[in-house]
Swiss-Prot record:
This is Kinetochore protein Spc25. Component of the Ndc80 complex, which is composed of Ndc80, Nuf2 and Spc25. The keyword Cell cycle applies. Belongs to the SPC25 family. It comes from Drosophila virilis. Disulfide bonds: none annotated. Acts as a component of the essential kinetochore-associated Ndc80 complex, which is required for chromosome segregation and spindle checkpoint activity during meiosis and mitosis. Required for kinetochore integrity and the organization of stable microtubule binding sites in the outer plate of the kinetochore. Participates in SAC signaling that responds specifically to disruptions in spindle microtubule dynamics. The NDC80 complex synergistically enhances the affinity of the SKA1 complex for microtubules and may allow the NDC80 complex to track depolymerizing microtubules. The keyword Cell division applies. One of its GO terms (biological process) is mitotic metaphase chromosome alignment. Keywords: Cell cycle, Cell division, Centromere, Chromosome, Coiled coil, Kinetochore, Meiosis, Mitosis, Nucleus. GO terms for cellular component: Ndc80 complex; nucleus.
Amino acid sequence: MSNQFNTRKRLMAMLANEMRLEQEENAIAKQSAKFHSKFATTMENIKRQQHESKKLNTLLNQRRDEVEKRNALKNAVRDKLAEEEQHCAEMQAQLGKKKQERDKLIACAHILSEAANTYINRKALPERVKGVAVSPDNGQWIPFDFNAHDRQGLAALWTQVNRSSRNINKWRQLSSVGNSSMPAPSGKENANVSMTSVIEIDLTSPPSQK
């Protein structure tokens, strides 16, 4: 009977150990499942973060390219602006020079008008010098029409309207101013400019009789 009791006791101990092992296995299985679940979630998060990081890198590269293009455009605009400012400064200088030349031409035109009572048709300029002058001797109207660069034409007009003229000194002054610093037009000789340039101005009123 003692042997039966011992056998039963051993069986109970074995059953208890088996149940304990089974519980431990279940606990380990639960922990393993939980670990694998967390691991899978972590891997998914890592993949998602890697994908987002890739997108951010792509966007960053795009933004970097845009910044480089904007900087290049800004530099180009700045260079163009500097070029335009330089061009404007040169144009201002040219305009100032042209204004001085125009003022000198206007002064010459006043001398011409006073010296010879000359009217110039502005519609014929700048190709031709066309108009009418009044002879100081008899008040005769003398029409003229010649090429704007024809020095001989102006010389002939000078001779015709200044016979016995009391304003000969003004004509000489006009010629002197004309020969000093008149600008030469492109493609024309300087010799054909000095005398003709001074009368290429429209006089807005007809000549007066003296």
